[in-house]
Amino acid sequence: LGYHMVGDVHLGDWGLQMGLIIEELRDRKPELVYFDESYTGEYPTEPPFTISELEDIYPTASKKAKEDECFKERAQTATFKLQNGYAPFTAIWKHIMNVSLADLKRNYGNLDVHFDLWKGESDAEPYIPWLIQDLQDKGLAYESQGALVVDIAEPTDSKELPPCIVRKSDGAALYATSDSGTILEREKDFAPVKYI
C-alpha cells in the first residue's frame, strides 16, 4: 500500500521472433528492397505488410522453424544482424513495431487496459554491453562451449540448475540478457523499491 506504480507492457520485440518474421517476409516477398544487398537508398516509410499479414507471418514462420533447420538458422542469423544494427532489418523491425503497437494499443484500449510505458526488450539493448562487461569484470560470467554464461544455482536449490546463457556462441543476446538489461534500465530510471 502507498506505492507509486509504473506499468510497462514490456514487448517481446528483440528476439528470435523478429528474425522469424524477417525471414518469412523474405520468402513471401523476396523482391522487397530490404533483401537486396546492393540497395543503398532510403527504405520505404510504408510497411510492407498489414497487421493481418503480420498475424499470419509469425505463426507460419514459427512452425516452419520447427520443421526446417535451415530456415531456423536463417532466422537466427537475421536476429543477430538485427541486434547488431543491420540497417535493412532495422527498417523492417521499425515497421513491425509501428504496425504491432498501433494494433496492441487499440486492443488494450478496448479492454480499458493502460500502461505508463510501452517499452520492449529492444529498449534494454544499450545496457547489454555494459551488463556483459560488468559480469565479466566481476568474474561472474565465463565462456562455456563458445557461449557466455553465469552460474545461477544456489546451495539451497532442490535441483541442479544449469548456468544462464547471457550471450550465445553466435554473439546474439537472449531473453535473460535483455531482461537483465531491463532491470538495469529500471534501476537507473526509477530506482524501484519493488518489482512485480
State what each model feature region is.
Residues 1-196:
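NTP-dependent nucleotidyl-transfer catalytic core
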